[in-house]
From Swiss-Prot:
UniProt-annotated binding residues for ATP: 13-20
Annotated Pfam families: Guanylate_kin (PF00625)
Native species: Oceanobacillus iheyensis (strain DSM 14371 / CIP 107618 / JCM 11309 / KCTC 3954 / HTE831)
Enzyme Commission numbers on file: 2.7.4.8
Protein name, per record: Guanylate kinase
Swiss-Prot/TrEMBL catalytic activity: GMP + ATP = GDP + ADP
Length: 206
């Protein structure tokens, strides 16, 4: 039995497009996927477990990891760092498990630069009007912030060319089914398994 290396899948798209909803539904149906655990410098909250909820680091440790190139992406939010640790992802992939990362567009572009062999999926809204409705329905943003998010979304949509696949999130189940198809298709790509099968042939002829 050939043991395939896992694949890193990155789901990204503008704020309000439904990344979290699609990811949660996907994980209900695809139990073999490993969700990427983020690293942070924020304080651990009651009940949180290191290596389960986050990997917790001091600011000094985190900044050293940045210098050492040990983060696939990182950002600073409310005076704390958040990022995706390279070692965790690479070790999980080597064990044959797929890793799934749900992230904002800017973070995805950082991952693309640091880990170009990942599979990048852009979650696209059915329309900008629908995206606006989804953001407004949260009830957490002012009108000014909604307009800023829509402006940012337009800019992010223009970055779609950096992705391998585009999935329109018109209905959650439709989007999930398309992502599942992408995962299956990627595992059947010739370049991913050719070396392994060629070795079997060579061993059989030797």
């Amino acid at each position: 039995m050939i043991k395939e290396k896992g694949i890193l899948f990155i789901l990204s798209g503008p704020s309000g497009v439904g990344k979290g909803t699609v990811r949660k539904k996907l994980f209900e149906e695809e139990t073999d996927l490993q969700y990427s655990i983020s690293m942070t410098t924020r304080d651990r909250r009651p009940g949180e477990v290191d290596g389960v909820d986050y990997f917790y680091k001091t600011k000094e440790e985190f900044e050293q990891l940045i210098k050492d190139g040990q983060l696939l992406e990182y950002a600073q939010y409310v005076n704390n760092y958040y990022g995706t640790p390279r070692n965790y992802v690479e070790e999980t992939l080597e064990n044959g498990q797929d890793v799934f990362l749900e992230i904002e567009v800017q973070g995805a572009l950082q991952v693309k630069e640091n880990f170009p062999e990942g599979v990048f999926i852009f979650l696209f809204p059915p329309s900008l009007d629908e995206l606006k409705n989804r953001i407004v329905s949260r009830g957490t943003e002012s009108q000014e912030l909604v307009l800023n998010r829509l402006k940012e979304a337009r800019n992010e949509i223009e970055m779609m060319d950096a992705y391998d696949y585009v999935v329109v999130n018109d209905k959650v189940q439709h989007a999930v089914d398309k992502v599942k198809t992408i995962i299956k298709s990627e595992h059947l790509k010739r370049e991913r398994i050719a070396k392994q099968y060629k070795k079997i042939l060579e061993d059989g002829l030797s």
